[in-house]
């Protein structure tokens, strides 16, 4: 309400489109009490609804019982989709907020189209992070030690893989690639960590241009020897949050 919006949408998602989220990005359990996966929460000034898939129908019903949040069994007969709900519950001139960095463009565009049917609009604004941090201690970003695998383990150096990416950029008529998937960052740099359960990846981005490659990762996560190996392979280091500003520059 303070942001001048009628509602906000939260998804089980992060800026890397990860299947398993770092606790830092997993806001849905805190705001809804629902601890399942692959869910979407819409909170408006007049009501709330959470969509979960068939694995979590029973869990959702139990965890949301006694709250104002309606548990939507996604895919069941008679249950509206998120898009149908938005069209029905937003009127002309009203706004839905979401954190655009954590919602894929194709999905966000679908929400925008659904809102437009009733004259409402979508706006990318993160109101969840400041609210979360004002109410409790938000989990920190993962900070497990990172290490580089050897070329004997991976079959190619980071420099060779960067060259492969540049060849593909030329074919596509492009000049840069923002690498956001954690598995893709790991493949490109040969870097591994333990930031996610059962997944040997580090929370990081990479940006490949025709003359540079930058790894965006929290300072201190790589030891000096591995940082030098990356530098020798043409990879420079910048802090994790600096990707957007770097792209804009």
Residue ranges and their predicted role:
Residues 1-90, 103, 107-248:
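N-terminal accessory/capping or targeting/presequence segment of soluble
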Residues 94-101:
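Acidic beta-strand-to-loop metal/phosphate-binding motif
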